[in-house]
């Protein structure tokens, strides 16, 4: 596919790196992630453990990933689930990735999307214990809501004694939402 070849030429991704695919809604970010996943499976299936995290995604998208990548380790929460379910599945996926790295594996985690994950943490924090008493920052984001998504994204690393964790995530911009802009800027 040309898309993955262009990405490889313009912005090559090395083991242990983290990267963002930033664009407006409905511009093909999820399709690009699917193409990248297919390319990784085709070229590095034996060397790299591929994981996919789909947060607050349409059920059709989840099904498309599962059909296109049989046997892939896919963690997904659909958009008809509660915010707490989105946050749980993300934490489960990142902890699994960390354990694989500790076991010496090279892991590539594709995440769609870090914006929706941050929204889920914001929703979970504002509706959880003491949520109504929590202070809000720019864009109506609850203080501390972006801490966990930032930590999850920062988990990417290349270790000497074990494996590596590479994370490539999507981020939304130009949504006319101050919250999404605050998430992206953070």
Listing of model-derived features with the role each one plays in the protein:
Residues 1-21, 27:
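P-loop NTP-binding catalytic core
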Residues 27-29, 34-186:
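P-loop NTPase catalytic core
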């Amino acid at each position: 596919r040309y898309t993955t070849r262009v990405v490889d030429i313009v912005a090559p991704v090395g083991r242990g790196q983290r990267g963002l695919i930033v664009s407006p809604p409905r511009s093909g970010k999820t399709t690009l992630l699917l193409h990248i996943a297919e390319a990784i499976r085709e070229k590095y299936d034996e060397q790299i453990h591929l994981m996919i995290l789909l947060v607050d995604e349409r059920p059709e998208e989840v099904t498309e990933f599962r059909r296109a990548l049989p046997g892939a380790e896919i963690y997904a929460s659909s958009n008809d689930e509660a915010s707490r379910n989105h946050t749980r599945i993300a934490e489960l996926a990142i902890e699994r990735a960390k354990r694989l790295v500790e076991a010496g594996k090279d892991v590539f985690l594709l995440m769609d999307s870090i914006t929706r994950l941050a929204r889920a943490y914001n929703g979970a924090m504002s509706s959880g214990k003491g949520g109504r008493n929590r202070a809000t920052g720019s864009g109506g984001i609850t203080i501390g809501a972006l801490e966990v998504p930032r930590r999850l994204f920062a988990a990417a690393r290349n270790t000497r004694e074990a494996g590596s964790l590479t994370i490539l995530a999507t981020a939304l911009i130009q949504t006319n939402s101050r919250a999404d802009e605050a998430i992206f800027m953070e």
